[in-house]
Design a protein with these regions (language model features):
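C-terminal capping/gating helix-and-loop segments adjacent to ligand/active sites or protein-protein/ligand interfaces
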Residues: 661, 725-812
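Short, well-ordered beta-strand elements
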Residues: 348-360, 377-384, 412
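Conserved Ser/Thr-centered positions that define the repeating blades of beta-propeller domains
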Residues: 77-78, 179, 197, 268, ...
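Extracytoplasmic/periplasmic substrate-binding proteins
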Residues: 550-681
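Hinge/lid segment of periplasmic solute-binding proteins
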Residues: 417-470, 485-486, 647-653
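Extracytoplasmic "Venus flytrap"/periplasmic binding protein-like
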Residues: 378-445, 615-624, 641
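Extracytoplasmic/periplasmic solute-binding protein
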Residues: 460-464, 469, 488-587, 598, ...
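Periplasmic-binding protein-like
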Residues: 496, 684-724
Length: 814
C-alpha cells in the first residue's frame, strides 16, 4: 500500500518573513500577545501535491504527482497530517495512447474524480523540423471523466459539459471542485460564467449558478457556494440552488478600490468561516457577523515565503489548521500545522525595518531567505508608495526623510528611485566597506561592480542585481551602431519593412525617452547642475526623428497584422492591433502629482527592459531588441539563439568611453538607525541572493557564485539532472521549447546550456563594466513630458526646452 512518514520532533515558531506596510513609523507600544506557531510535519517525498482536503470520516487527504514519473499519487492521514500513507493511482488507459490529466480531486467519501484525455505519444521531431499551416490542424481533445473507486477500480462517467456553452467556441477543459456535502461543482460556459452542481453519486444535474461575467474562483463554506470575480463576491445556497446575495462587507474588505493585493479564496472545509490569503497574510471572514480579521501574518509565517506555493489550507478544529505547500527551493512538499498560542508575543521583540519606495518582490524573497536563518528576528518591510493609496511620491519621500532625520527611519533602505548621492552628502548612509570588502576579497561578489560604488575607500550603497545594455539583431545592422546618431540611422533603414517591428517594444513618445535615458541622457545637466540646453536640444531633434520612423513602421506593421489575421476563420472585422488607444491616454491624470506618480511605475520597465532573446527563437516579429539580459535564463536563450541563427548577434552598448551597467535593488544602511549590526547582517544576506535567482528577470546577481553555480554542469549532475551532450553544437542540452501560433505553424527548439567559452565570455563582459547609472526621475519625467508635447506639435522645440528649464529651475537649485 505504501509507506508511513515519520513526524518531525522539533516544533518551530513561525518563520519571520515580511509584511508590506506604508510609511516609516515605528511604535514603542508593549507587544500584544498571541499568534499562530508552525509545527512542520515530515511530508511525502519525491512528489508535488495539488490538493488538500478533509474527508467525511475525518481523515485528511492529499493528491499529487510523482516528480520522476508524473503519475498521480494519493496520500491519506489518520492523525491530522502527522503521518501519511501513500498509494500510486492507476489512470484510465487506451491502447496506443497516453493519458493526460486536467484535474483530479477527492470526493468527500474517499472516491477520486479525474478529468483526463487520451493523446498520441509524443514523437521527437527531427532537428529544424517545422509544421506549416497547410498540414497542421488543431483538434480539441475529447475530455473524459472517471471515478477511481476506493478499491482502485475505475468507473467511467458520461458528462457532456459542452452543452452549457452559449456558442461554438470551446473554453477548454472544465475545472471542478468537490463540496463537503459530496456533490461536484463544475465551472462551465463559453466564458466560464456558469457553475453546475452535480450529484456526487449519480452525476445528475442538480443546480446551475450563473454569474454576471467570468467567474474567477469558487469555494464552499458549509452549505454555501461562494463565487468570486474581479468586482463581486456572491453567496448561493447549495441545498436549493438559490442566490443569497452579495457579501458586501467582504467585497469592500477584500476587493475594494483601496485594496492593493488581490485575494485567493480557500476551500478549508469550514462550516462558518471563509478564509482567503494575500501577500500580507491569511484572513478569516465570519459568515454570521460579516467581520474580517487577519489570523496569520505573512511576516511571521511561511505564507510570506515567495518560494512556498500554498496548495491547501484546512480547518482541523478551533484555532487549528493544516496547510500544504509546494516548496520551490527544495522541489518538495511542506506540510505545516498551525496552532494558536496565546502565551507568546504577537510579533518577535527583536525587529529590523527595511524600506523601498515601490514594492519589490525580489527584496521580499531575499528577506524571506534571511528570516529562515534568523527566526528570532522580525523583518518588517515598509513601502513608500502603494498604488491607489493616495500617497504621492513627494509625500512618501518627505515622510521617509523626516523619519530618517528624526532617528526613527528604517534600518535598511532600498535606494532605487531615491537620490542616494543626496543622502551620502548629508551623512545619512552608513559606510558598508567592512562587510563588502571581505566579499570582494574572497570573490563572492563582482569586484568591479563594488568598486564602481567605492568613494575614498568607503561604500555607502551597492546593487544586488544589474543588467548591461545590449542591442540584439542582424549582425550587419547592429555593428553600425556606436552612438545615438547611428541608432537613429539604423531605425530609419529598418522603418520601411512592414512584416516586422523595428523594436520588440511598442513605444510612446515618453517611453522612448525613458528607454534611451541611461545611454544618452547623462549630459542633460551641466556640472553646475543647470540644464544643458544644447545637449537637450540635440537629443530632442534626434529622438523626434527616430520616433517618426518608429511610428511609420508600427502603422505599417499593424496593417500587415490585420491583413494576416483577417485570413483566420471567424475573424472579427472590428479587430485592430493599432496601439493608438494605448498611447491616447498615456500619462493622463486628474492632477499633475498623480500623473508623475503613474510615471514612477512605468519607469520600472522602460528604464531597464530585458532583451528577451527567446522572442527571436520562434516568431521573430521584430528586427531589434534593445535592453539588458534579464539574467541566467535569458542568457541561456541568447546562447541557444546564436547557435541556431548565425545571422543574429548582439553588441554591448556603451556611453562613450563608459561601460555602463544598470543597477537594481540598491541597498544602503541608515547611518542614524538603531540596529546597524543587524542591518549589516541583512545586507550581507541580500548580497548572497536566493535559490530562485536563475528565474529572476532583474538581471544578474552581484554574487559571482550564483553565476558559477547556475552554469556548472557538474553541479547539475550532482543535483540529479540527466544532461545530454550535443557534440555538433559543443553544448549540453537543457531541454526543448515548443511554439505554435493561430495559423498552425509550430516549431521546437533544443535549448542549449552555455559552455565554458560562453560563460568565460559573459564573465569578461561583466568584469569590464565600470560605471553604474543613476536616475534623476524628476528630471527624466519632465524631459519626457515636454518631449511628448513637442513631437505632438503642441509646442515648438525652443518652447519645450524652455519649459524644462523653467519647470526645473527651483528643483535643481536646491
Amino acid at each position: 500500500m505504501g509507506k508511513n512518514s515519520k513526524k518531525i520532533v522539533a516544533i518551530t515558531t513561525a518563520l519571520t518573513m515580511i509584511a508590506a506596510i506604508t510609511g516609516c513609523s515605528k511604535g514603542n507600544e508593549k507587544s500584544s500577545m498571541g499568534r499562530y506557531v508552525e509545527e512542520r510535519y515530515e511530508a511525502p517525498t519525491n512528489s508535488y501535491v495539488n490538493e488538500l482536503s478533509i474527508l467525511e470520516d475525518g481523515r485528511i487527504a492529499m493528491l499529487g504527482f510523482s516528480n520522476e514519473t508524473n503519475t498521480p499519487i494519493s496520500f491519506i492521514s489518520d492523525d491530522g497530517g502527522q503521518n501519511w500513507t501513500t498509494q500510486d493511482l492507476e489512470l484510465p488507459k487506451q491502447d496506443g495512447k497516453e493519458t493526460y490529466t486536467n484535474n483530479i480531486g477527492y470526493l468527500s467519501d474517499g472516491r477520486i474524480l479525474v478529468s483526463y484525455y487520451f493523446e498520441e505519444p509524443y514523437v521527437e521531431p527531427t532537428e529544424g523540423e517545422t509544421q506549416s499551416e497547410e498540414n497542421y490542424v488543431y483538434e480539441e481533445p475529447e475530455y473524459k471523466y472517471s471515478i477511481i473507486e476506493t478499491d482502485g477500480s475505475i468507473s467511467d462517467i458520461d458528462l457532456d459539459l459542452t452543452s452549457y456553452n452559449t456558442d461554438s467556441d470551446s473554453s477548454g477543459y472544465n475545472n471542478f471542485k468537490c463540496a463537503p456535502n459530496g456533490d461536484v461543482f463544475f465551472s462551465v460556459g463559453s466564458n466560464q460564467e456558469l457553475i453546475v452542481q452535480f450529484d456526487g453519486k449519480t452525476f445528475e444535474e442538480k443546480n446551475i449558478y450563473e454569474g454576471n461575467d467570468y467567474i474567477d474562483n469558487f469555494v464552499f463554506v458549509g452549505d454555501s457556494l461562494i463565487t468570486t470575480s474581479y468586482d463581486e463576491i456572491v453567496e448561493y445556497d447549495i441545498t436549493n440552488g438559490k442566490e443569497k446575495g452579495n457579501l458586501k462587507e467582504l467585497e469592500k474588505e477584500a476587493i475594494g478600490e483601496k485594496v492593493n493585493y488581490y485575494p485567493t479564496f480557500i476551500n478549508s472545509g469550514s462550516k462558518n468561516t471563509l478564509y482567503y490569503y494575500t501577500t500580507l497574510g491569511v484572513y478569516a471572514y465570519d459568515m454570521k457577523s460579516g467581520k474580517t480579521n487577519m489570523i496569520i501574518d505573512s511576516a511571521i509565517s511561511t505564507f510570506g515565503d515567495e518560494e512556498s506555493n500554498l496548495i491547501g489550507f484546512i480547518e482541523k478544529g478551533e484555532k487549528n489548521f493544516l496547510a500544504a505547500f509546494n516548496d520551490w527551493s527544495s522541489d518538495g512538499v511542506s506540510v505545516i500545522n498551525y496552532t494558536y498560542n496565546p502565551d507568546i508575543t504577537s510579533t518577535p521583540d527583536n525587529q529590523i525595518v527595511i524600506y523601498s519606495l515601490l514594492e519589490n518582490y525580489m527584496i521580499r524573497q531575499a528577506i524571506s531567505a534571511y528570516s529562515k536563518e534568523n527566526p528570532d528576528v522580525y523583518v518588517k518591510y515598509e513601502i513608500g508608495l502603494n498604488y491607489n493609496d493616495g500617497v504621492t511620491q513627494s509625500d512618501a519621500l518627505k515622510t521617509l526623510n523626516t523619519e530618517i532625520m528624526g532617528g526613527n527611519g528604517p534600518d535598511v533602505i532600498i535606494l532605487d528611485g531615491l537620490t542616494a548621492e543626496s543622502y551620502i552628502s548629508k551623512g545619512l548612509l552608513e559606510d558598508m566597506s567592512d562587510i563588502i570588502n571581505p566579499l570582494i576579497e574572497n570573490e563572492t561578489i563582482f569586484k568591479n561592480i563594488a568598486q564602481a560604488y567605492t568613494k575614498d575607500g568607503k561604500i555607502y550603497q551597492i546593487p544586488t542585481y544589474f543588467k548591461y545594455p545590449i542591442l540584439l539583431g542582424n549582425k550587419e545592422d547592429i555593428n553600425s551602431v556606436s552612438d545615438l546618431s547611428s541608432l537613429v540611422e539604423l531605425t530609419k533603414k529598418l522603418s520601411t519593412q512592414t512584416d516586422k517591428m523595428i523594436f520588440n517594444n511598442y513605444f510612446s513618445a515618453r517611453t522612448l525617452v525613458y528607454s534611451l535615458y541611461n545611454l544618452y541622457g547623462n549630459d542633460w545637466l551641466k556640472h553646475d547642475n543647470t540644464i544643458n540646453e544644447d545637449a537637450l536640444t540635440d537629443f530632442f531633434i534626434k529622438v523626434n526623428e527616430m520616433y517618426g520612423y518608429i511610428k511609420t513602421n508600427q502603422d505599417a506593421y499593424n496593417k500587415f497584422m490585420e491583413d494576416k489575421y483577417s485570413q483566420l476563420e471567424g475573424f472579427d472585422n472590428g479587430f485592430s492591433v493599432d496601439n493608438s488607444e494605448i498611447d491616447e491616454d498615456y500619462g493622463v491624470g486628474d492632477e499633475e502629482d498623480s500623473e508623475v506618480d503613474y510615471e514612477v511605475y512605468d519607469l520600472q520597465y522602460y528604464l531597464n527592459p530585458s532583451v528577451s532573446a527567446d522572442s527571436f527563437l520562434f516568431d521573430q516579429s521584430s528586427s531589434l531588441s534593445m535592453g539588458g539580459m534579464s539574467g541566467i535564463n535569458d542568457y541561456i536563450n541568447l546562447i541557444t539563439l546564436l547557435n541556431n541563427n548565425s545571422d543574429i548577434g548582439y553588441k554591448i552598448l556603451t556611453r562613450g568611453e563608459e561601460n555602463i551597467f544598470i543597477p537594481s535593488n540598491i541597498v544602503g544602511i541608515n547611518a542614524k538607525g538603531k540596529n546597524k549590526e543587524q542591518a549589516k547582517e541583512l545586507v550581507t544576506s541580500l548580497l548572497k541572493g536566493y535559490s530562485r535567482d536563475n528565474y529572476s528577470n532583474n538581471g544578474f546577481s552581484i554574487n559571482l557564485n550564483k553565476l558559477n553555480n547556475a552554469f556548472s554542469v557538474e553541479k547539475m549532475k550532482k543535483d540529479g539532472y540527466e544532461l545530454e551532450y550535443d557534440e555538433s553544437k559543443n553544448h549540453y542540452i537543457q531541454g526543448t521549447w515548443g511554439y505554435s501560433d493561430e495559423f498552425g505553424n509550430s516549431k521546437e527548439v533544443t535549448m542549449l546550456l552555455p559552455n565554458d567559452e560562453d560563460v568565460n565570455k559573459l564573465k569578461f563582459e561583466i568584469e569590464n563594466l565600470n560605471v553604474g547609472t543613476t536616475v534623476n526621475s524628476v528630471l527624466l519625467i519632465e524631459v519626457a513630458k515636454q518631449f511628448e508635447s513637442y513631437v505632438n506639435g503642441d509646442i515648438s522645440l525652443e518652447d519645450s526646452i524652455n519649459k524644462v528649464v523653467d519647470n526645473l529651475d527651483l528643483y535643481l537649485s536646491e
